[in-house]
Amino acid sequence: MTMYAKNNTAGKDMLSLLEWNKEELTDIIKLAVAMKTNPAHYSHILSGKILGMIFDKPSTRTRVSFEAGILQLGGQAIVMSSKELQIGRGEPIKDTAHVMSEYIDAIMIRTFSHEKVEELAYHAEIPIINGLTDLHHPCQALADLMTIYEWKDQLEGVKLAYIGDGNNVCHSLLLAGAMVGIDICLAMPKGYEVDETILAKAENLAKQSGGKIFVTEDPKLAVTDADFIYTDVWTSMGQEDENAKRLADFGEKYQVNAELVSGAKPDYHFLHCLPAHREEEVTAEIIDGNHSVIYQQAGNRLHAQKALLAAILEAK
């Protein structure tokens, strides 16, 4: 089976999803589903490949899913932090990128500044995967799309409501959804909107795909007839000093609770990228309830990233 070679995606970076088109993204999702269904078929396709993983931020899902993923495809992983590399002592990113390109086949980096990832990709001769930055979290968006596809057997025309902070997760979800034709409703208070440049790019993608984007401060309006309701923490890593203000600004109005979800479709599903703060952005009743698919969603990080690795590393 050569499904992973359908598009010429070998060597491509995954920085913000904008490097990819709708067909390529859809193929990644379908390949991920195939890998989940029949993992043994793909167990040696990346034999001899080495993935370097650099972490500047703590990680559970990103680290374990990428490390397990490359191993399950027959490859290997080397896990590092910037503190363990010369880059942590002032070596230019340019030098690190060129040297790492001599040793390994791809780099996944989880860091703070998106500019750092872009600079690494500019100088590297190997694919760079963004494992999370302050602006984007594309690998999470791949898992989100896969989860939606598994439940609906399609992406176009699905209605998704995102309630909360216009953060990196929201940015990538917005771009991915717009690219594949999902109707996205965003609800967030003033001061927590998505980046204007990213929103403009998403709106352009939606015009091409037939998707719709609607932005409001009213979460009840956003969830009306929604197929999926998505939220994330109100305070991300590095924003701990703002926690009290953020809790006050979001308040009960933006909490995903029984009253809010009553406006969605009866068979709606709840999504959260995790980790979650129960009784803040979502009640335990909802996140632990029958409509929640958060563990399936988290599990799909593994399969979506395996498909991504196969696509960019010239799988055998």
Curated annotation (Swiss-Prot):
Q: What is its EC number?
A: 2.1.3.3
- Its predominant location is cytoplasm
Q: Which InterPro entries match?
A: Asp/Orn_carbamoyltranf_P-bd, Asp/Orn_carbamoylTrfase, Asp/Orn_carbamoylTrfase_sf, Asp_carbamoyltransf_Asp/Orn-bd, Orn/put_carbamltrans, OTCase_ArgI
- What does the UniProt entry say about where the protein is found? Cytoplasm
Which molecular-function annotation in GO is an example for this chain? ornithine carbamoyltransferase activity
- Cysteines joined through disulfide linkages: none
Q: Name one Pfam family in it.
A: OTCace
SUPFAM superfamilies linked to this entry: Aspartate/ornithine carbamoyltransferase
Q: Which residues bind carbamoyl phosphate?
A: S59, T60, R61, T62, Q86, R110, H137, P138, C139, Q140, C273, L274, R301
Q: Which residues bind L-ornithine?
A: N168, D232, S236, M237
Q: In which pathway does it act?
A: Amino-acid biosynthesis; L-arginine biosynthesis; L-arginine from L-ornithine and carbamoyl phosphate: step 1/3
Q: Which reaction does it catalyse?
A: carbamoyl phosphate + L-ornithine = L-citrulline + phosphate + H(+)
Keywords assigned by UniProt, alphabetized:
Amino-acid biosynthesis, Arginine biosynthesis, Cytoplasm, Transferase
Q: Which NCBIfam families match?
A: orni_carb_tr, PRK00779.1
Its biological purpose? Reversibly catalyzes the transfer of the carbamoyl group from carbamoyl phosphate (CP) to the N(epsilon) atom of ornithine (ORN) to produce L-citrulline.
What's this protein's name? Ornithine carbamoyltransferase
Lineage of the species this protein comes from:
Bacteria, Bacillati, Bacillota, Bacilli, Bacillales
